[in-house]
């Protein structure tokens, strides 16, 4: 299952398919970025070395924002809109993405 490929609209017989694939690819990229940032912030907060209370508050705020964004993307993968855009199984895609982070 390749999720890193998009086609040029000029070469595509069905331009809507290229757009649909680009939407899915961007959602996958955004999910990966959120996962990486969440892990980095959680590690930073867990170590707590050299972090002032103000920095800890700011990091927790950032963590919340990334968790919210990741949740929205997760919801998208289970949405009817996702199934209109793609034949992929959203649950399997998420399992695969979550395995990448481990």
Language-model segments: which ranges?
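Short, compact, well-ordered microdomains
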Residues: 73-102
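Intrinsically disordered, low-complexity domain-flanking/linker segments in eukaryotic proteins
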Residues: 39-65
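Acidic, low-complexity, intrinsically disordered interaction modules
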Residues: 56-81
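N-terminal acidic leader/helix
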Residues: 2-39
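Short, flexible helical or helix-coil boundary motifs
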Residues: 26-31, 35, 45, 49-52, ...
């Amino acid at each position: 299952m390749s999720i890193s490929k998009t086609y040029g609209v000029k070469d595509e017989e069905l331009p809507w398919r290229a757009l649909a694939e680009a939407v899915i690819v961007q959602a996958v990229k955004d999910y990966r970025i959120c996962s990486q940032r969440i892990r980095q912030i959680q590690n930073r907060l867990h170590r707590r070395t050299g972090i002032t209370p103000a920095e800890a508050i700011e990091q927790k705020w950032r963590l919340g924002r990334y968790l919210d964004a990741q949740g929205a993307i997760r919801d998208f993968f289970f949405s009817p809109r996702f199934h209109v855009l793609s034949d992929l199984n959203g649950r399997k895609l998420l399992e695969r993405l979550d395995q990448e982070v481990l």
